[in-house]
Structure formats: structure tokens, C-alpha cells
Amino acid sequence: MADLSFFFNPSSIAVIGASDTVGSVGYEIMKNLTEDFPGELYPINIKQKIIFDKPSYKSILDVPNKIEMAVIAIAAPFVSDVLEECGKKGVKGVIIVSGGFSEIGEKEREDKLLEISKKYGIRIIGPNCIGIYDNFSGVNTIFLSKDKISYPTKGKISFLSQSGAFAGLILDWTSKERIGISNVVSYGNKIDVNEADLLDYLCDDENSKVICLYIEGIRRGQRFMESAKRVSKKIPILALKSGKTKSGAKAASSHTGSLAGEDIIYDSAFKQSHIIRANNFEELFDMAKALEKQIFPKSDGVAIITNAGGLGVMTADALEMNGLRLANLGEDTIKKLKEQFPERVVVSNPMDLVGDADKERYEVGLKALLEDKDVGLIIVILLLQVPTLSLDSVDTVLKIKKSSDKPMIILGAGGEIITPYLKKLEEGGLAVYPSPERAARAAYALVNHAIVRGDIHRERKENIGVCKV
């Protein structure tokens, strides 16, 4: 596999088009790298001598030291000239954030860049992108001001996006949702480095446990499918594909120069490559959040335990709509629970502990379900507004979770008052969702990937691959 480490963890970076003009692209890139990147940083600007208290050079060729990676942020007509200079300098990788290429019909400009890339062996991300944010190495070429977006905590989810704006949005949104991110890559027109190259690289990245894709169109379909099929056996891959409609496909073409194609073809390609398709970005990260925990079921049977009967019924509906089945509880499990529970408790699946359930009742029910052979994972519904549940109940659930090798998903619906309860569950390593539909999406992602891994031996049904809710 091609080495792309110089993009994610370079020893030195040159910013061509660096600036100290507040609000400019070159300013924001320099500001972010100055604050985050621990390596050597070299501003390149033909007019300015000092930028961010660093000596600025008129050309990358004037820099006395070796440069591993460069970011180009200048007008499109001049990009090929500075790329040539990068080649002469021995730069390994270049991120071209500049727009003005095939997305506006200027394909000849891209052809020239590719010619230079092949001549010197330079790898290119872009053009028409915002580049890389790596939460571990400090690489941050995102030219969005930290005054306007928040950055997420460290996590194990990698996000690859053709759209730069969407990549920036994801950084801000995942921060708000308390979802940890490893890295975000915006690759734009992908004249060189594409989705397949990035999948191959991230497959061996210790900080990537889930890969999320935002795709507008794929050019080298067979190469992409081969990489995805290989990588998905090790790391779950989730994809959000836009351009489903004629209007969307037309918009994608003018946005990143993508050839969208019939959506049904992408649907089939994703299924063959074991990629889990999402319908929207909320769904994308709902599934990623569960998969990041790296605990996968050994059975496709799902158990529901609840103190709110209606939510249990809705969750059962949502699971079936996703092609999942409710676990068949064993006779021993049912007998044991009936002996310990009051008569009003419904001992079946869903298991309705009824509205006066306390932490002891949840503990008995959860332990029994975890011991049942047909139960692969459990959706724990907690109506935390009832007086019988408190923060102690959360501690009980977390204690049981730590002693089990079966995944547990939390459904906790409500408003601000229960937020501390849900936050504590998340901090304890559980994926938490506010509705039956979103909890079901997480369950289906876990079962889907367990089938791909070979942990569950069953055929992948047509509706195991695309969420139907």
C-alpha cells in the first residue's frame, strides 16, 4: 500500500500563500498550524517577510531545510508553477486547497498538475478541498476560524469527505454531540489521492477504528470496491452518498466535478463491498458511535429491556424495519426471571419492567439477558424521569456493562433534566440515543459488521446493508 504518512504526521510543512491578513485563507491555515502543529512550519509569500513571527520565503526553493509536506493556497492559474517548485524541492505530499479546476470546467489545469505529480512522484490531495485535521499529530490545514467552530475531542472515528464545507461542519457538530474524532480529510476533486488510497492507509492506522465517508461520486469504482472490501473486514466503513436525485447529481457535478451515476449502482457497490450506507449525517454518526466501542455481538438476536412499554414496542418495530430480529429467550431465562420479578413485569422480549422499576430490577433483568445464549446485544431503555431511577441506577448499568462482552445500547429520551444521567453513561463507554429509531440504527450497524467479521454466521439479507428507518 502507498505510504501517506507524510500527510498525516509530517515533520515539516510549508504554507504557500501564507498571510498575516486576518480572515484570509492563508491566515487561517497559518494560525491553526501555528497553534496545533509541533513540527517545523515555513510560510511562503512573495511579498511578506515575517508571518506569525516566522521568517517568510518568496519561494519554497529558498527554504534551507527539507520540507515533507506543503499546502498550496493561491489562485488556480499559479498553482502548477509552485507545484513544480515543490517537486524540485523534494516535497512528498501537497494539499491544494485552491478552487478553480474541473469543478468549473478547467480540467486542463488538473491535467497539468497530474503531469507534474508523475514527473516528481508527488502525492496530491485536492484541489478544491480544505485538507486534513488530525487530532493526534496536530496537522490542521482547515481554513476555518476557531472563533466560529469548535473542534472535537480525540476519538477513533475517521471522516473522509469530498466536500470541504461538510468536513468543517462535521468537526463542529461532533464537538457539540461529544463524539470523538481521530481525523478528518477533505479531498475535493481527488485528482490523485482518492477514497481507496485513504481507506488503505487508515486500515493500518491505530487511531482509526471506524471510517466514515461522504461521497458525491466515484471515478475508479473497481479500485474503490477492492479496497473497501478488504478494509471493511478489519474496520467498519460507513458511507453517506449524496446526489441520489437528478437535482442532487447535477449539483454534485458543479461542486466537485463528480460524475454521480445511477444511485442504484452505488447501492449495489456498497453492499458488495460490505459498506454500511447511511441516509443522513446524523444516522452516519449514530452508527459510528456504536461501532467505535469495538464490542460486537456473537448472535444476531437483540433483546430489549425497558421501564416504558410504549418505547419498547416502538423499538421492536424499528429493529424489524432494519432487518433485525428479537432474540428468543431461553426457557431457563424466563423461568429464572419469573421467580424473581413481581407478576406485573412482562417477562418476554421486549422485557417490560413497568414504571416502578428500580436499579435492582434492572440489574436482575440485565444479568439474565446477558447470560442468554440467543441474546447478542441489548437495547436498554431508561425512562429516567420516573422517581425510582436515580444516578445510582446509571452506576448499576455501567457496572454490568464492564462485566460483559456483549454490546449494550442505551435509549434515553427526554429533556435537559436527564442530560447529566446520559452524559455519565456516555463517559462510561456506552452509546446513548434519544429515540427508538436511532437506537435501532446503531444495533443494525453492530450486527452488520459482526456478520462481515464472521462473528455471526448468517446470510446478509438485502435490508442488512441499507437502513430502512
Where do the language-model regions lie?
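Catalytic-core regions of core metabolic enzymes
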Residues: 1-469
